Amino acid sequence: MTGAGTPSQGKKNTTTHTKCRRCGEKSYHTKKKVCSSCGFGKSAKRRDYEWQSKAGE
């Protein structure tokens, strides 16, 4: 039976996110080839949502 305890944490040594070419954030997923911050690799438009800012401001 495999658990998610201390021995399993030693397997987590691969780099998932690297620096994005467009926004510069460390959010570019190297396997998915998509930036989770700006949406680079998914869309030509910047990733932006209404819920990211306070409502009415």
UniProtKB/Swiss-Prot annotation:
Cellular component per GO, a single term: cytosolic large ribosomal subunit
Cofactor(s) the record lists: Zn(2+)
Chain ranges of zinc fingers (C4-type): 20-38
InterPro entries: Ribosomal_eL37 (IPR001569), Ribosomal_eL37/eL43 (IPR011331), Ribosomal_eL37_CS (IPR018267), Ribosomal_zn-bd (IPR011332)
SUPFAM superfamilies: Zn-binding ribosomal proteins (SSF57829)
UniProt binding sites for Zn(2+): C20, C23, C35, C38
Highest taxon above the source species: Archaea
Molecular function in Gene Ontology: rRNA binding; structural constituent of ribosome; zinc ion binding
Ranges for region Disordered: 1-26
Keywords, ordered alphabetically: Metal-binding, Ribonucleoprotein, Ribosomal protein, RNA-binding, rRNA-binding, Zinc, Zinc-finger
Statement: the UniProt record of this protein carries the keyword Cell membrane: no
Biased amino acid composition, Polar residues: 1-17
GO biological process: translation
A Pfam entry, by short name: Ribosomal_L37e
Cofactor notes: Binds 1 zinc ion per subunit.
Subunit-level organization: Part of the 50S ribosomal subunit. Interacts weakly with protein L4.
Function of the protein: Binds to the 23S rRNA.
Family: Belongs to the eukaryotic ribosomal protein eL37 family.
PANTHER family documented for this protein: 60S RIBOSOMAL PROTEIN L37 (PTHR10768), RIBOSOMAL PROTEIN L37 (PTHR10768:SF0)
Protein name listed in UniProt: Large ribosomal subunit protein eL37
Organism, as annotated: Haloarcula marismortui (strain ATCC 43049 / DSM 3752 / JCM 8966 / VKM B-1809) (Halobacterium marismortui)
